Amino acid sequence: MNEQPLIAALSLQRAGAPRVGGDRIRLLEAIARHGTIAGAAREVGLSYKTAWDAVGTLNNLFEQPLVEAAPGGRTGGNARVTEAGQALIAGFGLLEGALTKALGVLEGGVSAPEKALNTLWSLTMRTSNRNTLRCTVTRVTLGAVNAEVELALTDGHSLTAVITERSATEMGLAPGVEVFALIKASFVMLAAGGDPGRISACNRLTGIVAARTDGPVNTEIILDLGNCKSITAVITHTSADALGLAPGVPATALFKASHVILAMP
């Protein structure tokens, strides 16, 4: 009896970061062909919002932006896959080829399982956090119980996280170490404009509203921080209206240092 061959499905993950699978790579390839996120979304069968969110997640996940949207990109303008994006596409293709070879070993009766294991791996776990931001540690201040970790996100944007001293030590946090900062969207407060005034939240990221999605009760706001980085907040619909939040409006994301979770690549 002829059996259907097994198909290799590759996905890449880093600690605490969302999974990047073949569907996201296909989206990047489609953007490269069409030059727009809207055209790519139609080709791969995604809604425009889903495709836009996927691009934002990818840009936040990697050190260099994978896609650059020209002015007006949110409403159908041009988009360009960067050299880093092209390198990811090419590298993913090479890994898929290696995975297919390893799969052939498995189908052949696992006569050399160690060979397959050298080709199959996972770069770790999933996360449900809406915001996963790649950062570099700039300073660590250790206390008796807690540690304050300062992080560089982009030029002009920095974060502060407060974690346990034990966690900071076990993770080997020191200046120059790369980490992922995870912040739940519901933990992010928003203030209209660039100066929120006196407030206890030490993390303040000012940007421009890139997208607003309204639900019956809550509203999702995506704030463009520049350099292809973004942060998402979920606030009440009433609050979004009161603040006058709409695409193109400046706003500031606010959140506590204790609400930042750190994960290692």
From Swiss-Prot:
Domain Mop: 126-192, 198-264
Database matches in InterPro entries: Mo/tungstate-bd_C_term_dom, ModE, ModE-bd_N, Molybdate_resp_trans_reg, Mop_domain, Transp-assoc_OB_typ1, Tscrpt_reg_HTH_LysR, WH-like_DNA-bd_sf
Keyword list, A-Z: Molybdenum, Repeat, Transport
Pfam families referenced in this protein's UniProt entry, alphabetically: HTH_1 (PF00126), TOBE (PF03459)
GO molecular function annotations of the record: DNA-binding transcription factor activity; identical protein binding; molybdenum ion binding
GO biological process: molybdate ion transport
Transmembrane residue ranges: none
Family recorded in the similarity comment: Belongs to the ModE family.
Identification of the protein by name: Molybdenum-pterin-binding protein MopA
